[in-house]
């Protein structure tokens, strides 16, 4: 099991114009408060504005013989150094000016998911997390992301 760290690094910033598809790494994006990532199909006034996935989990998946790129599982932010799936709901993450709050761990993969059809399986249902944007700003590859510990 991966060691839990309080901080990590953004490895990719990905968006897609439609839901249920792979995302494309755009390297930098504007996150809007209570909306999500500008230009992403999942943005909106709901609890799954931004999806996050641990980079290490994608690397483990690739070691099994897959060859997936950033955004292949529909994740918005690919994070190195934090085991996203182990973060409890309500955890806050800071990346520069951006403040996110974890709202959901995992998801149900809908039948006929384009990602599952292409890749063969999807790790988002058990490794991905979702968050809402409490404070907006710009996020880019290489930015530090850290868990905000409550006093």
Give the residues covered by each predicted segment:
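Metal-cofactor-dependent catalytic cores
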Residues: 1-151
């Amino acid at each position: 099991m991966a060691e839990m760290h309080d901080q990590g690094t953004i490895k990719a910033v990905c968006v897609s114009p439609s839901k249920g598809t792979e995302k494309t790494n755009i390297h930098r994006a504007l996150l809007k408060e209570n909306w999500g990532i500008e230009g992403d199909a999942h943005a909106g006034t709901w609890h799954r504005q931004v999806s996050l996935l641990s980079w290490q989990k994608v690397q483990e998946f690739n070691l099994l013989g897959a060859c997936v790129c950033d955004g292949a599982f529909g994740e918005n932010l690919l994070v190195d150094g934090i085991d996203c799936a182990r973060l409890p709901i309500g955890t806050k993450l800071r990346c520069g000016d951006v403040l996110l709050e974890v709202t959901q761990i995992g998801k149900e993969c809908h039948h006929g998911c384009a990602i599952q059809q292409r890749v063969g399986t999807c790790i988002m249902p058990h490794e991905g997390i979702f968050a809402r944007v409490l404070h907006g700003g710009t996020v880019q590859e290489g930015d530090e992301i850290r868990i905000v510990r409550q006093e």
